[in-house]
Amino acid sequence: MSQRIKTAAVDIVHITSGRIASGMLSHEPIWYRAMAANMPTTVYQHKPHFEKLARIAQRESEKLNEFIKTRSKPVRVRTRHLYEPVHLKFMEDEIREIFYKQHPWELARPKLIVENSGDDHVTQDWSKMYQANKKLDGESVVQRTIYLLGEKKTHDQKALLEAYDKARFEFYKLRMAEDVQNVTAAEEADMFGACFSTSSVERNLFHEQKRIEDWKEKAVEMTLDMGAK
């Protein structure tokens, strides 16, 4: 068991007195009474200068809180962004993003992106959804929404959503009418004896399946040959 370090001669007298009182010592040491009667008044042990250490610690703390300058030169603003084109934002893009996020399968439908003269929009009347010279798609919803907004403020989100919902429901009606018309036409043609050839997808699946069957036969033959050897 570790003992407390004696820092002064008076500690020896106190410790010895306690041991005598507790019975640890059966008799007083020879020097006990002389030491108790003439206690030392001067401590010759070197003590650390706590005030000096406190000042050093305070000075180190002040250094940590000082402002440290890491650059010898001022920071220069990079000018490369000044020559980049300005980001253009249109309300039509916002409507397209909403529509195709809600109707991802519309992106799978074939689209005509080439115009005959480049001014087909001149002959389009967006007071109604159906256009004789344009196929029904997501762009129809966008243009119809813009037409319904009219002169209203573009930042009016409530008016924008109302116009979009109206154009969207008109789109649904025309899309369902197209589907019914296509199904009816196919049934009528089948009833009158029309023969429909296989589509490109069906032909590709047929050739793919044939390749798989050929590979399966060759794999079985190779397996049997290796087993016989």
From Swiss-Prot:
Family as reported in the entry's similarity comment: Belongs to the mitochondrion-specific ribosomal protein mS23 family.
Subunit structure and binding partners: Component of the mitochondrial small ribosomal subunit.
A Pfam family the protein falls into: MRP-S25
GO cellular component, one term: mitochondrion
Gene: RSM25
Alphabetical list of InterPro entries matching this protein: Ribosomal_mS23_fun (IPR016939)
Gene Ontology molecular-function annotations: structural constituent of ribosome
Subcellular location: Mitochondrion
Disulfide feature: none
Protein name per UniProt: Small ribosomal subunit protein mS23
